[in-house]
Amino acid sequence: MRLFLLLSVLSCVAQAAKPPVLFRNATVITMDGGKVLAKHDLLVQDGRIARISPTGTASAPEGSTVVDGTGRFLMPGLAEMHAHIPGPEPAGYAEDLLALFAAHGITTIRGTLGQPLHLELRSRIERGELIGPRLFTSGPSINGNTAPDAATAERMVREQKAAGYDFLKMHPGLERKVFDALAATSRAERIPFSGHVSTAVGVQAALAAKQSAIDHLDGYMRALAEERCLDGSEPAGFMGVGLADCAVESRIPELVTATKKAGTSMVPTQILIEQWAAPPTDGILRSRAAYRFLSPTTIAQWRKARMQFVQASPQAKRFVELRRELLRQMHAAGVPILLGSDAPQLFNMPGESTFAELELYGAIGLSPMDALATATVNVARFFGQEDRFGRLREGLEADVLLLSADPGINLANVRKLEGVMLRGRWLPRARLDVMLDEIAARQARR
């Protein structure tokens, strides 16, 4: 009872700490039907966007915090659709990681390797007790080891649904009959499944089963490969890199059509692949300020692993080119692309890797607005929550970024954060810098 009262008090305090905020005279990039509103005010009350109006046409409510938006740009918060949240050890690291996402303007994440702690973290964020992005979390991994037979897979689906996880995360190694049982049970339990594509399943079967999302473009290289390369004599390697020289590029349109028809979304994690496949230039990590949130030991381990990958994967360049072409054709065909970088993961740090993934979409050929949609409105649509977030529209939850330059002209401008609003909680640049310094200091002691 005492704990319940304490949590209730904390929740009330968190809610009370959200006075009205008026962003005055900004350019509002709504991500809502392409509307960009110059010289507009945006008012946030009670955690939601209360009003968007031409500057000078309405006054600020009494007690409002007024933020000068002159020469600045407002856009919806970004989403990271392939995030990893740690467990309870080391103490406090999971909370720091969530704050790290938020401090970079990531206001929604999809956690792809869940555990019970993450359900608790999700609740704490929703109650306003913890600074962090909106969290959608999978349950624990379903793979060839954890689900060796159909009965086990069916039980795991039911248990994870009952526990309150948002979706199921599949990893490699599932036998076809196990996958079929998982897919059927997930439909019956009304919980989506997504993630990897097991070799015994294949992309076409995953699409036919209506897998909600495929991460890493997993399985697509195998689907493109000539049959002679699939007898086991050619090692497939990381995400199919060893099959790149066997890939038949003319098969891409057929695969894209099947993907579009299935309604399956793509979470590419392209920056993860390109980081791995880049020339082994020494110091690739040292120049990045984001890596102050890592221990030197971790950086050394990542560098060693990357060198081994590059040396063992002469087809890496072709692999990257094929993946880029897949993404180009998928986007052109209208396959939903959801920004996911895989962070924190090898060479990917929260925030930095999301920005880099976004910029890669621009390099591949997406317009800035289409690229921004992969991290905003596309994500809300994927979760069936367009009435909650993903756009700047009156009535939606106030996840808002204040930028000093226009991301609709240059995607790199998403890095120019002057403040982040998390469901009505305003964090100006000075506050973000303090948060980041504190996280780095704690990480240095771990």
Predicted regions and their residues:
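Divalent metal-coordination and catalytic microenvironments
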Residues: A26, L42, G47, G71, ...
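Divalent metal-dependent hydrolysis catalytic cores, especially in the metallo-beta-lactamase
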Residues: L97-P116, G132-S141, K161-E175, I191-S194, ...
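Metal-associated gating/positioning segment near the N- to mid-region
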Residues: R72-E129, N145-A151, K177, Q204-K210, ...
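C-terminal helical cap
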Residues: A26, Q308, Q315-A316, V320, ...
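Histidine-rich, glycine-flanked metal-binding segment
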Residues: V28, G33-M75
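Bacterial N-terminal signal peptides
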Residues: R2-C12
